[in-house]
Amino acid sequence: MLVAMTTASYVTILVTLLFHILTINAKTVTKRAKETNLEDDEPQYWRGRFAKDVVPQFWKGRFSDPQFWKGRFSDPQFWKGRFSSHGNKRRYVPGRYGREFQGRFGREFQGRFGREQGRFGREEDQGRFGREEDQGRFGREEQGRFGREEDQGRFGREEDQGRFGREEDQGRFGREEEQGRFGREEDQGRFGREEEQGRFGREEDQGRFGREEDQGRFGREEEQGRFGKRDEDQGRFGKREDQGRFGKRDEDQGRFGKRDEDQGRFGKREDQGRFGKREDQGRFGRELLAKLNKRTTSIQEDPQTRFRDVQMTRRNVAKKDKIEESNDEEANKS
């Protein structure tokens, strides 16, 4: 009797398990069939928000939030496009709702999806992610980059810090009121004390490399010129009144020596040719001289050449007078 009851209980348990398995399998098959035939109750998000053959599921997910649907299908039909012909008659007439007073989509007091709103709400009382009047970038308006604005600077409190510390008592690397670039400001210059030094020493008694009041560029100013004594007794490289460019003054020298009346290009003018004495030289002297004389003779017969020579002579005379005047002015200055 006991064996029969045990066998019956085992059979009952086995049948129950088999029924549950079949029921679960049937539900799965039914669900798959519904998904295949698009008969399930889930909103078909993959079809797109505005699919015509899908009814919005107000009772599921975020669609139950009325704020989500606010402005989407209400009176201003923004989904028609910004430049739809709807409302153009009123848009272009002057008056309160004229084109010069309207916003992006119509009236002057509306924003993108409603009246005077910002990105996610009404414009007049929100900022980027909340209310404008009391928030900053990530919170309230009275804060700075990483905290409250009125009591912080870049990395701390603004009113009592500078770049890396307190503002009112530091400079770039220390205290501002008593330092310069690398030390105290009121009693130093660039590399020392300001009131008693110049660039490399004391200011009131030095020049560039020494004392200012008694030196020139490289020595004493009142008694030297560029490289030595002052201009009244030297020229460019020596005494001015008795030298020329490289030696004695112009009245007794030429370009490289004595003046033009007794030298040529590289020596005496009246007794040399191009590379030597003119009257006794050959291929580069006599022949050239002969050609030059022949060419000069033929040119002299041309009236235009004579006019040009007169002009050149006048120009040379004017140039010579100007040079002499400049030399006289330099002599007077010295």
Curated annotation (Swiss-Prot):
The keyword Secreted applies. Residues 27-116, 122-125, 131-134, 140-142, 148-151, 157-160, 166-169, 175-178, 184-187, 193-196, 202-205, 211-214, 220-223, 229-233, 239-242, 248-252, 258-262, 268-271, 277-280, 286-334 form a propeptide. Residues 1-26 form the signal peptide. Keywords: Amidation, Neuropeptide, Repeat, Secreted, Signal. It is found in: Secreted. Neurons associated with smooth muscle fibers. It comes from the Eukaryota. Its main location: secreted. One of its GO terms (cellular component) is extracellular region. Residues 115-334 are annotated as: Disordered. Not known but it could act as a transmitter at neuromuscular synapses. It comes from Calliactis parasitica. This is Antho-RFamide neuropeptides. The modification Phenylalanine amide is found at residues 120, 129, 138, 146, 155, 164, 173, 182, 191, 200, 209, 218, 227, 237, 246, 256, 266, 275, 284. GO terms for biological process: neuropeptide signaling pathway. It holds the Pfam family FARP. Residues 115-289, 303-334 have a biased composition (Basic and acidic residues). Belongs to the FARP (FMRFamide related peptide) family. InterPro entries: FMRFamid-related_peptide-like (IPR002544).
